[in-house]
């Protein structure tokens, strides 16, 4: 980029590189850590931070009333995410920590640990290698606003906070059937989650303090504290109903912790819409262009415009149009490159449809540097496609378009003169759909982070799903 020439134009490769490698988020995380820890020499600190490479490890807090299942969900998440579980019990059982020994002594006397001591235990545990490299999950901590503020003061910030919720009557009834395996720490229930193995059944123990009165007292204290804890975690907190099967709660929690929060990183949408003929790609592209000022790039329309304008490429394309043959990929990509390299596409972003039709075209797009950052597959059943396309008609006198089911002509006279576009004939539609589905599996494999949508619903409902997929960051893929 020549510094002596104005106005400056940023090459499209620069923002694309920054976006793909999360440069903005990396710099933001380093700045946050610098402000939190305030090291005397920032350079070695930043180098150490980069070596850790732990910006995206799980940092999760799970809160909830007694018997809501938070410990079970926390243990399942730990196994799935390979993270460290931090509970009050395992924090005070650390035999190599003087702080833990003192906390254990106080806990045996008072059945509670002072907030300052508990937060010190958490700080010591989070400084260990497994928590730094693999992440952590706090189970039932913080319990009070004081604990939440002390944790925040030390710069310990979770990425996701989950609060489980259920009616008190359900929790009291559930707590009465609670059983614990003393060997593994696994929690079972006499009604909802009874182990099939007789060996485990025989060693299960009834925990203390699960009577109806004691549970009600704990619930009262929880409700008094949680309303003051929740405001400490705006924008990163999700409430999940615990009054449903444990597996459903787990999958909702897992989906949430795999999601990424919206950032202030600059983002230029490069949207690719894929789907069979008649799936609504053109309509969705027009809606996106209208609302977000994206450049609507329709491959077929570009080719027609090139022919109509009698450009150099248009003259090469015209013979293929006249013979009703497919335009070669090399020529098609040159026309497409010419459009996507224009400044409006670089600055505003684009929504592309009509290409790629197969894996070769997709690889060509990638090699040319036109990598979409959002890909959507619009799935529509075969019968719905046939209904949408084969019943379309046009009035040759007025040019008005009709649909025999959704927008029938007002009079018999108009209906008698309606014509069908040859492209909407049943055989033509079947051929196009067959061609798409032959290549769709390869395209789905190539675009692994693509979002699949049900296109057989109201167009504005589909648009809302697409809009949500563009605005929100893509979820993390955790094996």
UniProtKB/Swiss-Prot annotation:
One of its GO terms (biological process) is ventricular system development. AMP 2 binds at residues 325-327, 354-357, 361. One of its GO terms (molecular function) is (d)CMP kinase activity. Transmembrane segments: none annotated. Residues 298-327 are annotated as: NMP 2. Pfam families: ADK. Keywords: ATP-binding, Cell projection, Cytoplasm, Cytoskeleton, Kinase, Nucleotide-binding, Transferase. Residues 391-424 are annotated as: LID 2. Residues 58-258 are annotated as: Adenylate kinase 1. Expressed in respiratory cells (at protein level). Residues 177-206 are annotated as: LID 1. The keyword Kinase applies. Its main location: cytoplasm. AMP 1 binds at residues 140-143, 147, 203. ATP 2 binds at residues 278-283, 392. Its EC number is 2.7.4.3, 2.7.4.6. InterPro entries: Adenylat/UMP-CMP_kin, ADK_active_lid_dom_sf, P-loop_NTPase. Residues 269-471 are annotated as: Adenylate kinase 2. It is an enzyme of class 2 (transferase). It is found in: Cytoplasm, Cytosol; Cytoplasm, Cytoskeleton, Cilium axoneme. Nucleoside monophosphate (NMP) kinase that catalyzes the reversible transfer of the terminal phosphate group between nucleoside triphosphates and monophosphates. Has highest activity toward AMP, and weaker activity toward dAMP, CMP and dCMP. Also displays broad nucleoside diphosphate kinase activity. Interacts with CFAP45 and CFAP52; CFAP45 and AK8 dimerization may create a cavity at the interface of the dimer that can accommodate AMP. Belongs to the adenylate kinase family. This is Adenylate kinase 8. The lineage of its organism: Eukaryota, Metazoa, Chordata, Craniata, Vertebrata.
